[in-house]
Swiss-Prot record:
This is Alkyl hydroperoxide reductase subunit F. Homodimer. Keywords: Disulfide bond, FAD, Flavoprotein, NAD, NADP, Oxidoreductase, Redox-active center. GO terms for molecular function: flavin adenine dinucleotide binding; NAD binding; NADH-dependent peroxiredoxin activity; thioredoxin-disulfide reductase (NADPH) activity. Pfam families: Pyr_redox_2, Thioredoxin_3. Serves to protect the cell against DNA damage by alkyl hydroperoxides. It can use either NADH or NADPH as electron donor for direct reduction of redox dyes or of alkyl hydroperoxides when combined with the AhpC protein. GO terms for biological process: cell redox homeostasis; response to reactive oxygen species. It comes from Staphylococcus aureus (strain NCTC 8325 / PS 47). GO terms for cellular component: cytosol. Binds 1 FAD per subunit. NAD(+) binds at residues 347-361.
Length: 507
Protein backbone atom coordinates (compact mmCIF):
# COMPACT_ATOMS: atom_id res chain seq x y z
CA UNK A 1 0.00 0.00 0.00
CA UNK A 2 3.02 2.27 0.44
CA UNK A 3 5.09 3.44 -2.51
CA UNK A 4 8.82 2.79 -2.66
CA UNK A 5 9.88 6.28 -1.54
CA UNK A 6 7.53 6.28 1.43
CA UNK A 7 8.65 2.79 2.46
CA UNK A 8 12.29 3.89 2.38
CA UNK A 9 11.55 6.97 4.51
CA UNK A 10 9.49 4.92 6.95
CA UNK A 11 12.19 2.28 7.30
CA UNK A 12 14.68 4.98 8.28
CA UNK A 13 12.27 6.47 10.81
CA UNK A 14 11.56 3.08 12.37
CA UNK A 15 15.26 2.77 13.14
CA UNK A 16 14.65 5.52 15.73
CA UNK A 17 12.43 3.21 17.79
CA UNK A 18 13.72 2.66 21.31
CA UNK A 19 11.52 -0.29 22.32
CA UNK A 20 9.10 -2.85 20.98
CA UNK A 21 5.63 -1.90 19.74
CA UNK A 22 2.63 -4.16 19.15
CA UNK A 23 -0.25 -3.43 16.80
CA UNK A 24 -3.46 -4.95 18.18
CA UNK A 25 -5.98 -5.01 15.34
CA UNK A 26 -9.72 -5.57 15.22
CA UNK A 27 -10.44 -6.94 11.75
CA UNK A 28 -13.48 -8.23 9.90
CA UNK A 29 -14.14 -9.69 6.47
CA UNK A 30 -14.85 -6.32 4.82
CA UNK A 31 -12.59 -4.60 2.28
CA UNK A 32 -11.43 -1.91 4.71
CA UNK A 33 -10.32 -4.56 7.20
CA UNK A 34 -8.31 -6.24 4.46
CA UNK A 35 -6.69 -2.92 3.54
CA UNK A 36 -5.83 -2.24 7.17
CA UNK A 37 -4.32 -5.70 7.66
CA UNK A 38 -2.23 -5.25 4.50
CA UNK A 39 -0.96 -1.88 5.75
CA UNK A 40 -0.08 -3.12 9.25
CA UNK A 41 1.59 -6.24 7.86
CA UNK A 42 3.64 -4.14 5.47
CA UNK A 43 4.79 -1.84 8.27
CA UNK A 44 5.45 -4.70 10.70
CA UNK A 45 7.73 -6.40 8.18
CA UNK A 46 9.98 -3.33 8.17
CA UNK A 47 11.23 -3.66 11.75
CA UNK A 48 11.91 -6.53 14.16
CA UNK A 49 10.65 -4.25 16.94
CA UNK A 50 7.11 -4.36 15.51
CA UNK A 51 4.53 -7.13 15.89
CA UNK A 52 0.88 -7.62 14.95
CA UNK A 53 -1.88 -9.47 16.80
CA UNK A 54 -5.67 -9.50 16.54
CA UNK A 55 -8.32 -8.77 19.16
CA UNK A 56 -11.90 -7.52 19.12
CA UNK A 57 -12.03 -3.77 19.81
CA UNK A 58 -14.87 -1.24 20.01
CA UNK A 59 -14.71 -0.54 16.26
CA UNK A 60 -13.83 -2.66 13.24
CA UNK A 61 -11.56 -2.06 11.43
CA UNK A 62 -9.32 -0.43 14.02
CA UNK A 63 -6.06 -1.03 15.85
CA UNK A 64 -4.25 0.06 18.98
CA UNK A 65 -0.57 0.97 19.21
CA UNK A 66 0.69 -0.68 22.40
CA UNK A 67 3.79 -1.75 24.21
CA UNK A 68 3.96 -5.54 24.65
CA UNK A 69 1.66 -6.36 27.56
CA UNK A 70 0.73 -2.70 28.13
CA UNK A 71 -2.10 -0.71 26.59
CA UNK A 72 -1.22 2.91 25.84
CA UNK A 73 -4.70 4.14 24.96
CA UNK A 74 -3.73 5.11 21.39
CA UNK A 75 -6.21 3.75 18.83
CA UNK A 76 -6.79 4.37 15.12
CA UNK A 77 -10.26 3.47 13.78
CA UNK A 78 -9.95 3.33 10.02
CA UNK A 79 -6.84 3.38 7.85
CA UNK A 80 -4.47 6.25 8.80
CA UNK A 81 -3.10 7.17 5.40
CA UNK A 82 -3.23 10.61 3.77
CA UNK A 83 -2.50 13.37 6.26
CA UNK A 84 -2.84 10.93 9.17
CA UNK A 85 0.06 8.70 8.16
CA UNK A 86 2.44 11.01 10.03
CA UNK A 87 0.22 10.62 13.09
CA UNK A 88 0.71 6.86 12.94
CA UNK A 89 4.47 7.14 12.54
CA UNK A 90 4.73 9.54 15.49
CA UNK A 91 2.57 7.25 17.61
CA UNK A 92 4.85 4.30 16.86
CA UNK A 93 7.97 6.25 17.83
CA UNK A 94 6.47 7.75 20.99
CA UNK A 95 4.99 4.46 22.19
CA UNK A 96 8.41 2.86 21.63
CA UNK A 97 9.87 5.30 24.14
CA UNK A 98 11.20 7.99 21.81
CA UNK A 99 11.15 11.31 23.68
CA UNK A 100 8.60 13.78 22.25
CA UNK A 101 9.72 17.14 20.88
CA UNK A 102 7.65 19.02 23.43
CA UNK A 103 8.62 21.44 26.18
CA UNK A 104 9.14 19.85 29.58
CA UNK A 105 6.64 22.29 31.07
CA UNK A 106 3.94 20.93 28.72
CA UNK A 107 4.85 17.33 29.56
CA UNK A 108 4.61 18.18 33.27
CA UNK A 109 1.14 19.70 32.73
CA UNK A 110 -0.01 16.49 31.01
CA UNK A 111 1.36 14.29 33.80
CA UNK A 112 -0.49 16.32 36.44
CA UNK A 113 -3.94 15.82 34.88
CA UNK A 114 -6.15 13.81 37.24
CA UNK A 115 -9.35 11.97 36.39
CA UNK A 116 -10.39 9.80 33.46
CA UNK A 117 -10.21 11.25 29.96
CA UNK A 118 -11.37 9.26 26.93
CA UNK A 119 -11.04 11.36 23.78
CA UNK A 120 -12.48 10.50 20.37
CA UNK A 121 -11.56 12.57 17.30
CA UNK A 122 -13.51 12.32 14.06
CA UNK A 123 -11.33 13.18 11.07
CA UNK A 124 -11.13 13.03 7.30
CA UNK A 125 -7.94 11.91 5.59
CA UNK A 126 -7.89 15.10 3.48
CA UNK A 127 -8.09 17.35 6.55
CA UNK A 128 -4.90 19.33 7.16
CA UNK A 129 -6.00 20.52 10.60
CA UNK A 130 -6.78 17.06 11.93
CA UNK A 131 -3.24 15.65 12.41
CA UNK A 132 -2.34 18.40 14.90
CA UNK A 133 -5.24 17.37 17.14
CA UNK A 134 -4.72 13.63 16.67
CA UNK A 135 -1.00 13.87 17.41
CA UNK A 136 -1.56 16.05 20.48
CA UNK A 137 -4.11 13.67 22.00
CA UNK A 138 -2.04 10.60 21.12
CA UNK A 139 0.94 12.12 22.90
CA UNK A 140 -1.18 12.92 25.94
CA UNK A 141 -2.33 9.29 26.00
CA UNK A 142 1.26 8.03 25.88
CA UNK A 143 2.35 10.34 28.71
CA UNK A 144 -0.61 9.99 31.09
CA UNK A 145 -2.25 6.58 31.73
CA UNK A 146 -5.50 8.35 32.69
CA UNK A 147 -5.93 9.47 29.06
CA UNK A 148 -6.99 7.45 26.02
CA UNK A 149 -7.58 8.60 22.46
CA UNK A 150 -9.24 7.13 19.39
CA UNK A 151 -8.89 8.64 15.92
CA UNK A 152 -12.02 7.84 13.88
CA UNK A 153 -12.15 8.20 10.10
CA UNK A 154 -15.62 9.53 9.37
CA UNK A 155 -15.53 8.09 5.85
CA UNK A 156 -15.22 4.57 7.27
CA UNK A 157 -17.61 4.95 10.20
CA UNK A 158 -20.38 6.85 8.44
CA UNK A 159 -23.19 6.05 10.86
CA UNK A 160 -21.23 7.48 13.80
CA UNK A 161 -20.18 10.56 11.85
CA UNK A 162 -23.52 11.22 10.14
CA UNK A 163 -24.23 14.38 12.14
CA UNK A 164 -20.64 15.62 12.14
CA UNK A 165 -20.23 18.36 9.55
CA UNK A 166 -16.81 19.77 10.41
CA UNK A 167 -13.55 18.09 11.34
CA UNK A 168 -11.67 17.59 13.49
CA UNK A 169 -14.55 17.03 15.91
CA UNK A 170 -13.34 16.03 19.38
CA UNK A 171 -15.45 14.32 22.03
CA UNK A 172 -14.42 13.81 25.66
CA UNK A 173 -16.13 11.03 27.61
CA UNK A 174 -18.97 11.04 25.09
CA UNK A 175 -19.58 14.81 25.19
CA UNK A 176 -18.59 17.36 22.54
CA UNK A 177 -15.25 18.91 23.52
CA UNK A 178 -14.18 21.05 20.57
CA UNK A 179 -14.00 21.55 16.81
CA UNK A 180 -11.24 22.69 14.51
CA UNK A 181 -7.51 22.92 14.93
CA UNK A 182 -6.29 22.77 18.52
CA UNK A 183 -2.75 22.74 19.80
CA UNK A 184 -1.78 20.66 22.79
CA UNK A 185 -1.75 23.89 24.80
CA UNK A 186 -5.32 24.65 23.66
CA UNK A 187 -6.46 21.22 24.82
CA UNK A 188 -4.75 21.60 28.18
CA UNK A 189 -6.30 25.04 28.60
CA UNK A 190 -9.79 23.63 27.92
CA UNK A 191 -9.09 21.02 30.58
CA UNK A 192 -8.25 23.79 33.04
CA UNK A 193 -4.46 23.42 32.92
CA UNK A 194 -2.47 26.50 31.94
CA UNK A 195 1.22 27.24 31.55
CA UNK A 196 2.89 28.73 34.59
CA UNK A 197 3.30 32.47 34.06
CA UNK A 198 6.68 32.34 35.82
CA UNK A 199 8.08 30.51 32.79
CA UNK A 200 7.62 33.75 30.84
CA UNK A 201 8.10 36.31 33.61
CA UNK A 202 11.76 35.39 34.06
CA UNK A 203 12.70 36.13 30.45
CA UNK A 204 15.13 38.95 29.73
CA UNK A 205 13.86 41.87 27.61
CA UNK A 206 14.03 41.36 23.85
CA UNK A 207 15.38 43.61 21.15
CA UNK A 208 12.54 42.51 18.87
CA UNK A 209 9.42 40.66 19.98
CA UNK A 210 7.19 39.37 17.18
CA UNK A 211 3.55 38.62 17.91
CA UNK A 212 2.13 36.03 15.50
CA UNK A 213 3.47 32.91 13.81
CA UNK A 214 2.72 33.15 10.09
CA UNK A 215 4.92 33.92 7.06
CA UNK A 216 5.44 37.57 8.03
CA UNK A 217 6.43 36.58 11.56
CA UNK A 218 8.87 33.88 10.46
CA UNK A 219 10.52 36.15 7.92
CA UNK A 220 10.85 38.98 10.44
CA UNK A 221 12.31 36.69 13.10
CA UNK A 222 14.95 35.23 10.81
CA UNK A 223 16.01 38.68 9.57
CA UNK A 224 16.34 40.15 13.07
CA UNK A 225 18.14 37.07 14.40
CA UNK A 226 20.62 37.31 11.53
CA UNK A 227 21.30 40.89 12.64
CA UNK A 228 22.31 39.58 16.05
CA UNK A 229 19.26 40.96 17.82
CA UNK A 230 17.66 39.13 20.74
CA UNK A 231 14.47 37.91 19.08
CA UNK A 232 11.31 36.34 20.44
CA UNK A 233 8.11 35.04 18.88
CA UNK A 234 4.77 34.76 20.68
CA UNK A 235 2.35 32.67 18.63
CA UNK A 236 -0.50 30.23 18.81
CA UNK A 237 1.23 28.12 16.14
CA UNK A 238 4.03 28.53 13.62
CA UNK A 239 2.60 28.88 10.13
CA UNK A 240 -0.59 30.63 11.21
CA UNK A 241 -3.47 30.54 8.75
CA UNK A 242 -1.20 28.95 6.13
CA UNK A 243 -1.57 25.68 8.04
CA UNK A 244 -5.13 25.53 6.71
CA UNK A 245 -4.12 26.07 3.07
CA UNK A 246 -4.20 22.99 0.85
CA UNK A 247 -2.09 23.71 -2.21
CA UNK A 248 0.42 26.53 -2.71
CA UNK A 249 1.57 26.98 -6.30
CA UNK A 250 2.57 30.66 -6.39
CA UNK A 251 5.49 30.71 -3.95
CA UNK A 252 8.31 31.47 -6.35
CA UNK A 253 11.07 28.78 -6.70
CA UNK A 254 8.75 26.19 -5.11
CA UNK A 255 6.54 24.80 -7.85
CA UNK A 256 4.08 23.17 -5.49
CA UNK A 257 3.72 22.60 -1.76
CA UNK A 258 1.03 22.37 0.90
CA UNK A 259 0.26 24.64 3.81
CA UNK A 260 1.36 22.05 6.35
CA UNK A 261 4.65 21.43 4.53
CA UNK A 262 5.27 25.16 4.22
CA UNK A 263 4.62 25.66 7.94
CA UNK A 264 6.86 22.74 8.88
CA UNK A 265 9.68 24.15 6.75
CA UNK A 266 9.15 27.60 8.26
CA UNK A 267 9.41 26.16 11.78
CA UNK A 268 12.59 24.27 10.85
CA UNK A 269 14.13 27.44 9.40
CA UNK A 270 13.29 29.40 12.56
CA UNK A 271 14.89 26.64 14.66
CA UNK A 272 18.20 27.18 12.87
CA UNK A 273 18.58 30.54 14.61
CA UNK A 274 18.72 31.72 18.21
CA UNK A 275 15.06 32.68 18.29
CA UNK A 276 12.94 32.23 21.42
CA UNK A 277 9.77 30.80 19.86
CA UNK A 278 6.99 30.69 22.46
CA UNK A 279 4.09 28.79 20.89
CA UNK A 280 0.67 27.80 22.17
CA UNK A 281 0.23 31.17 23.85
CA UNK A 282 -1.56 34.34 22.76
CA UNK A 283 -1.00 38.02 23.46
CA UNK A 284 -3.90 39.92 25.03
CA UNK A 285 -2.54 43.48 25.31
CA UNK A 286 0.31 45.75 24.27
CA UNK A 287 1.48 48.98 25.87
CA UNK A 288 4.40 51.33 25.25
CA UNK A 289 5.98 52.82 28.36
CA UNK A 290 9.04 55.01 28.86
CA UNK A 291 11.13 51.92 29.66
CA UNK A 292 9.95 49.38 27.07
CA UNK A 293 7.09 48.03 25.01
CA UNK A 294 5.18 45.55 27.17
CA UNK A 295 3.17 42.64 25.78
CA UNK A 296 0.75 40.88 28.13
CA UNK A 297 0.04 37.18 27.54
CA UNK A 298 -3.18 35.28 28.19
CA UNK A 299 -1.70 33.67 31.32
CA UNK A 300 -0.92 37.09 32.81
CA UNK A 301 2.81 37.09 32.07
CA UNK A 302 4.33 40.28 30.68
CA UNK A 303 7.19 40.34 28.16
CA UNK A 304 9.29 43.43 27.48
CA UNK A 305 11.03 44.47 24.28
CA UNK A 306 12.70 47.47 22.65
CA UNK A 307 10.55 46.95 19.55
CA UNK A 308 7.52 44.85 18.63
CA UNK A 309 6.41 43.57 15.23
CA UNK A 310 2.71 42.69 15.10
CA UNK A 311 2.13 39.88 12.60
CA UNK A 312 -1.02 38.22 13.91
CA UNK A 313 -2.50 37.68 10.46
CA UNK A 314 -6.19 37.19 9.78
CA UNK A 315 -8.94 34.61 10.21
CA UNK A 316 -11.98 33.65 8.18
CA UNK A 317 -14.47 36.46 7.62
CA UNK A 318 -18.06 35.51 8.44
CA UNK A 319 -21.27 36.41 6.63
CA UNK A 320 -22.84 37.88 9.80
CA UNK A 321 -26.35 36.89 8.77
CA UNK A 322 -29.05 35.17 10.87
CA UNK A 323 -28.46 31.47 11.43
CA UNK A 324 -24.77 31.46 10.57
CA UNK A 325 -23.21 31.58 14.03
CA UNK A 326 -25.37 28.87 15.60
CA UNK A 327 -24.83 26.52 12.65
CA UNK A 328 -21.03 26.81 12.40
CA UNK A 329 -19.68 23.23 12.35
CA UNK A 330 -23.27 22.08 11.77
CA UNK A 331 -23.23 22.66 8.04
CA UNK A 332 -21.56 26.08 7.94
CA UNK A 333 -17.87 25.53 7.20
CA UNK A 334 -14.81 27.48 6.15
CA UNK A 335 -12.36 24.79 5.00
CA UNK A 336 -13.44 22.82 1.90
CA UNK A 337 -10.36 20.59 2.04
CA UNK A 338 -11.07 19.56 5.63
CA UNK A 339 -14.84 19.30 5.63
CA UNK A 340 -15.65 18.64 1.97
CA UNK A 341 -15.60 14.81 2.30
CA UNK A 342 -18.32 15.03 4.96
CA UNK A 343 -20.71 16.34 2.29
CA UNK A 344 -20.16 13.56 -0.24
CA UNK A 345 -23.15 13.27 -2.61
CA UNK A 346 -24.90 16.20 -0.92
CA UNK A 347 -25.82 19.70 -2.15
CA UNK A 348 -23.73 22.63 -0.94
CA UNK A 349 -23.21 26.34 -1.51
CA UNK A 350 -20.00 28.32 -1.72
CA UNK A 351 -20.24 32.00 -0.80
CA UNK A 352 -17.65 34.17 -2.53
CA UNK A 353 -16.53 34.62 -6.13
CA UNK A 354 -12.86 35.36 -5.58
CA UNK A 355 -10.01 32.90 -6.10
CA UNK A 356 -10.66 31.13 -2.79
CA UNK A 357 -14.37 30.72 -3.46
CA UNK A 358 -13.96 29.48 -7.01
CA UNK A 359 -11.17 27.08 -6.02
CA UNK A 360 -13.40 25.76 -3.23
CA UNK A 361 -16.28 25.23 -5.67
CA UNK A 362 -14.01 23.38 -8.10
CA UNK A 363 -12.66 21.10 -5.36
CA UNK A 364 -16.10 20.40 -3.90
CA UNK A 365 -17.61 19.63 -7.30
CA UNK A 366 -15.55 16.45 -7.38
CA UNK A 367 -17.00 15.27 -4.06
CA UNK A 368 -20.53 16.56 -3.58
CA UNK A 369 -23.67 16.14 -5.67
CA UNK A 370 -24.08 19.81 -6.60
CA UNK A 371 -22.44 23.17 -5.88
CA UNK A 372 -24.10 26.59 -6.07
CA UNK A 373 -21.66 29.51 -5.97
CA UNK A 374 -23.00 32.87 -4.75
CA UNK A 375 -21.34 36.21 -5.55
CA UNK A 376 -22.68 39.56 -4.35
CA UNK A 377 -21.17 41.50 -7.26
CA UNK A 378 -22.26 41.36 -10.88
CA UNK A 379 -19.35 39.14 -11.90
CA UNK A 380 -16.84 36.76 -10.36
CA UNK A 381 -13.53 38.21 -9.20
CA UNK A 382 -11.44 35.05 -9.57
CA UNK A 383 -8.68 34.62 -12.14
CA UNK A 384 -10.01 33.82 -15.62
CA UNK A 385 -8.30 30.43 -15.70
CA UNK A 386 -10.21 29.42 -12.56
CA UNK A 387 -13.49 30.79 -13.89
CA UNK A 388 -13.08 28.82 -17.12
CA UNK A 389 -12.47 25.63 -15.19
CA UNK A 390 -15.47 26.28 -12.94
CA UNK A 391 -17.83 26.90 -15.86
CA UNK A 392 -16.75 23.63 -17.46
CA UNK A 393 -18.20 21.61 -14.56
CA UNK A 394 -21.67 20.17 -15.07
CA UNK A 395 -22.70 20.09 -11.41
CA UNK A 396 -22.04 23.77 -10.61
CA UNK A 397 -24.43 26.74 -10.78
CA UNK A 398 -23.25 30.34 -10.48
CA UNK A 399 -25.45 33.08 -9.04
CA UNK A 400 -24.16 36.65 -9.29
CA UNK A 401 -25.87 39.75 -7.91
CA UNK A 402 -26.97 37.46 -5.09
CA UNK A 403 -27.11 38.69 -1.49
CA UNK A 404 -27.27 35.89 1.08
CA UNK A 405 -29.68 36.85 3.87
CA UNK A 406 -30.16 33.83 6.16
CA UNK A 407 -28.76 30.40 6.93
CA UNK A 408 -31.74 28.09 7.46
CA UNK A 409 -31.81 25.14 9.85
CA UNK A 410 -32.37 24.04 13.45
CA UNK A 411 -29.67 21.58 14.52
CA UNK A 412 -28.05 21.51 11.06
CA UNK A 413 -28.13 23.47 7.81
CA UNK A 414 -31.13 22.78 5.58
CA UNK A 415 -30.97 25.76 3.25
CA UNK A 416 -29.97 29.33 2.51
CA UNK A 417 -32.06 32.39 1.70
CA UNK A 418 -30.78 34.93 -0.78
CA UNK A 419 -31.99 38.07 -2.54
CA UNK A 420 -31.71 38.57 -6.28
CA UNK A 421 -30.23 42.08 -6.43
CA UNK A 422 -31.61 42.61 -9.94
CA UNK A 423 -35.26 41.90 -9.11
CA UNK A 424 -35.39 42.24 -5.33
CA UNK A 425 -36.97 38.80 -5.08
CA UNK A 426 -36.01 36.50 -2.21
CA UNK A 427 -35.38 32.80 -2.77
CA UNK A 428 -34.81 29.72 -0.61
CA UNK A 429 -32.34 27.10 -1.80
CA UNK A 430 -32.46 23.76 0.00
CA UNK A 431 -29.02 22.29 0.66
CA UNK A 432 -26.88 20.53 3.26
CA UNK A 433 -23.77 22.68 3.64
CA UNK A 434 -22.44 26.20 3.17
CA UNK A 435 -18.76 27.01 2.66
CA UNK A 436 -17.96 30.66 3.41
CA UNK A 437 -15.09 32.07 1.34
CA UNK A 438 -15.46 35.86 1.52
CA UNK A 439 -12.00 36.86 2.62
CA UNK A 440 -10.22 37.36 5.90
CA UNK A 441 -10.75 39.35 9.09
CA UNK A 442 -7.60 40.83 10.69
CA UNK A 443 -6.70 39.54 14.16
CA UNK A 444 -6.56 42.91 15.89
CA UNK A 445 -9.23 42.73 18.60
CA UNK A 446 -6.54 42.10 21.25
CA UNK A 447 -4.81 45.42 20.52
CA UNK A 448 -7.40 47.46 22.45
CA UNK A 449 -6.79 50.62 20.37
CA UNK A 450 -3.05 50.54 21.10
CA UNK A 451 -2.29 51.38 17.45
CA UNK A 452 -4.28 53.00 14.65
CA UNK A 453 -6.69 50.75 12.74
CA UNK A 454 -8.67 51.48 9.58
CA UNK A 455 -12.41 50.92 9.11
CA UNK A 456 -11.76 47.24 8.28
CA UNK A 457 -9.88 46.67 11.52
CA UNK A 458 -6.49 46.45 9.77
CA UNK A 459 -3.38 48.07 11.25
CA UNK A 460 -2.44 51.24 9.38
CA UNK A 461 1.24 51.21 8.37
CA UNK A 462 3.59 53.32 6.26
CA UNK A 463 6.06 52.14 3.62
CA UNK A 464 8.52 51.12 6.37
CA UNK A 465 5.90 49.06 8.24
CA UNK A 466 5.73 51.62 11.05
CA UNK A 467 2.48 51.95 12.97
CA UNK A 468 1.51 55.29 14.51
CA UNK A 469 3.39 54.26 17.67
CA UNK A 470 7.21 54.54 17.41
CA UNK A 471 8.88 51.18 17.96
CA UNK A 472 5.77 49.17 17.10
CA UNK A 473 5.77 47.75 13.58
CA UNK A 474 3.29 45.53 11.75
CA UNK A 475 3.47 43.19 8.76
CA UNK A 476 1.38 40.74 6.77
CA UNK A 477 -2.36 40.18 6.50
CA UNK A 478 -3.05 42.03 9.75
CA UNK A 479 -2.12 45.33 8.06
CA UNK A 480 -3.81 47.59 5.50
CA UNK A 481 -1.47 46.24 2.83
CA UNK A 482 -3.77 45.74 -0.18
CA UNK A 483 -2.68 42.35 -1.50
CA UNK A 484 -2.75 39.37 0.86
CA UNK A 485 -0.28 36.76 -0.37
CA UNK A 486 2.26 34.54 1.38
CA UNK A 487 5.17 35.91 -0.61
CA UNK A 488 4.09 39.52 0.02
CA UNK A 489 3.73 38.86 3.74
CA UNK A 490 7.23 37.41 3.92
CA UNK A 491 8.64 40.46 2.18
CA UNK A 492 6.71 42.70 4.55
CA UNK A 493 8.09 40.79 7.53
CA UNK A 494 11.65 41.28 6.27
CA UNK A 495 10.97 44.98 5.69
CA UNK A 496 9.57 45.39 9.20
CA UNK A 497 12.59 43.56 10.65
CA UNK A 498 15.13 45.75 8.87
CA UNK A 499 13.32 48.90 9.94
CA UNK A 500 13.10 47.65 13.52
CA UNK A 501 16.87 47.12 13.40
CA UNK A 502 17.30 50.68 12.11
CA UNK A 503 15.03 52.00 14.87
CA UNK A 504 17.10 50.27 17.57
CA UNK A 505 20.33 51.71 16.17
CA UNK A 506 18.90 55.24 16.13
CA UNK A 507 17.31 55.02 19.57
Amino acid sequence: MLNADLKQQLKQLLELMEGNVEFVASLGSDDKSKELKDLLTEITDMSPRLSLSEKSLKRTPSFSVNRPGEETGVTFAGIPLGHEFNSLVLAILQVSGRAPKEKQSIIDQIKKLEGSFHFETFISLTCQKCPDVVQALNLMSVINPNITHSMIDGAVFREESENIMAVPAVFLNGEEFGNGRMTIQDILSKLGSTADASEFENKEPYDVLIVGGGPASGSAAIYTARKGLRTGIVADRIGGQVNDTAGIENFITVKETTGSEFSSNLAAHIDQYDIDAMTGIRATDIEKTDEAIKVTLENGAVLESKTVIIATGAGWRKLNIPGEEQLINKGVAFCPHCDGPLFENKDVAVIGGGNSGVEAAIDLAGIVNHVTLFEFASELKADNVLQDRLRSLSNVDIKTNAKTTEVVGEDHVTGIRYEDMNTGEEHLLNLDGIFVQIGLLPNTSWLNDAVELNERGEIVIDRNNNTNVPGIFAAGDVTDQKNKQIIISMGAGANAALNAFDYIIRN
